């Protein structure tokens, strides 16, 4: 198991060097600040998939967990991959991109939006999402974008611990891969 632990740690050394700190964040309760006429929603941002079986096990499962964790708050989704959105549209399946979803939420009277992406790192996809949100932020009283899974240095330690514990309980080998990021 030590060689697997070493591999996991090695995989995370590079990204840890790019981690961010929380110095620029102010903690406050988005949903606790709602007025009588305010409406809140959570918008989950996914890259997307064209495979229904995969979607059920991943995206739909995440959405369901979010709805369970935040009862009484509207939970929506948006997908970022233009290629996937195009392929789905050709099959007659409509999904919204983040801009479309935010416009729809605004038109439906939502005032407070929490956006959480399923991206792993603060890379190109997250930067693009933050730009899109910034362009529409004046439509809402409060709109916030949550950090990706691996953002601050301590996030890496939590993930390495979870992976290590999962490996210790597994009877099989686990393979970890990463998509290259140019930033």
Predicted regions and their residues:
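Sec-dependent N-terminal signal peptides
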Residues: 5-13
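Short connector loops at secondary-structure junctions
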Residues: 73-90, 150-151
């Amino acid at each position: 198991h030590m060689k697997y632990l070493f591999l996991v740690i090695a995989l995370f050394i590079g990204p840890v060097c790019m981690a961010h700190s929380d110095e620029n964040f102010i903690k406050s309760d988005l949903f606790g600040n709602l007025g009588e006429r305010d409406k809140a929603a959570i918008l989950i941002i996914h890259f997307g998939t064209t495979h229904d079986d995969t979607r059920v096990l991943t995206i739909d499962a995440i959405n369901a967990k979010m709805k369970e964790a935040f009862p009484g708050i509207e939970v929506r989704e948006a997908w970022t991959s233009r290629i996937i959105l195009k392929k789905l549209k050709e099959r007659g399946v409509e999904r919204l991109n983040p801009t479309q979803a935010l416009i729809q939420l605004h038109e439906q009277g939502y005032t407070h939006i929490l956006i959480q992406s399923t991206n792993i790192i603060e890379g190109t996809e997250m930067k693009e999402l933050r730009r899109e949100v910034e362009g529409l932020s004046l439509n809402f009283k409060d709109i916030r974008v949550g950090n990706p899974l691996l953002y601050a240095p301590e996030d890496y330690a939590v993930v390495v611990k979870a992976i290590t514990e999962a490996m210790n309980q597994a009877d099989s080998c686990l393979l970890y891969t990463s998509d290259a990021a140019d930033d």
